[in-house]
Amino acid sequence: MHNTDTFTGPSFPLRNRLARLAWNLACAILFRPTPVFMHAWRAWLLRAFGARVGRHAHVYPGVRIWAPWNLEVGEEAGIADGVILYSQDRIMIGRRAVISQGAHLCTGTHDTSHPWHPLMTKPISVGEQSWVAA
């Protein structure tokens, strides 16, 4: 999935970095400037980049998503403006769960016991009908 030895090279392969570049361009042009009510459009765009988004999910335009292909959003879930989904690994948000403004879900950290501090990732799962607040 990724290089754990960041001393020998970047943590993620070129393909991943190019995909994130394409996502960031699409996000800047087609996702973030959309009106708040266009949840279906944003869900479609996320699906086009590999996310799994359930019916009637509300993903607001101010959400920042690192890698949509690592995102799964359940039916009727809500992700508010100002949320950061740092999805270096999988983020699964259950049905009818809410991620409130200012929440930051981060799947990555660094091994501070190693001299090169290599990247370490673990998935995050937010259960059904849960509420994550900042």
How should each PLM-predicted stretch be described?
Residues 1-56, 96, 129:
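Terminal amphipathic alpha-helical/low-complexity segments used for targeting or macromolecular assembly
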